[in-house]
Amino acid sequence: MEKISRKKGSSYHRRHHVALVFQNYNLIDYLTPLENVRLVNKNADRKILSELGLDEKQINRNVLQLSGGQQQRVAIARALVSEAPIILADEPTGNLDEETAKDIIAILKRMSLDRQKCVIVVTHSKEVAQASDVVLELKKQQLKEKKK
């Protein structure tokens, strides 16, 4: 992986290397899921949203009419269609019920492998951590690899 510049003024460069998935989704509330995804990649099609479990009706409605799990799927779709090789997901299942959370993690893992993206997840959930390939634990300002 190429080095990402830390120089002042290089935020454009960093934005194209890291896609973010927030706990609170950060969707544009007056747009549809497809329009939200196309903000990141104007060539994105409905297929990505279908692969993430949204049906045609959900894809065409306002994002505020979707459940939390459906909105999180839209946020993940935005990250997946970006050109960024790294996805940083901050508590991507924090607002979701256990079943939806499991679905989201499985989808994120499968689709990131399909699209060759590195996913870094920040979480307090043991279940989410257990689904990861590598777990790093931050404790008392020390970062250590945790054995699974």
Question: Which positions does each model-derived feature cover?
Answer:
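ABC ATPase NBD coupling module
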Residues: M1-A19
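Conserved ABC nucleotide-binding domain
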Residues: R6, I48-L64
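Conserved ABC ATPase signature
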Residues: N62-L66, Q70-Q72
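Hydrophobic anchor residue at the start of the ABC signature
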Residues: I76
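Conserved catalytic motifs of ABC-family nucleotide-binding domains
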Residues: E83
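Catalytic Walker B motif of ABC-type/P-loop ATPase nucleotide-binding domains
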Residues: I87-D90
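Helix N-cap at the start of a conserved alpha-helix in ABC-type nucleotide-binding domains
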Residues: E98-T100
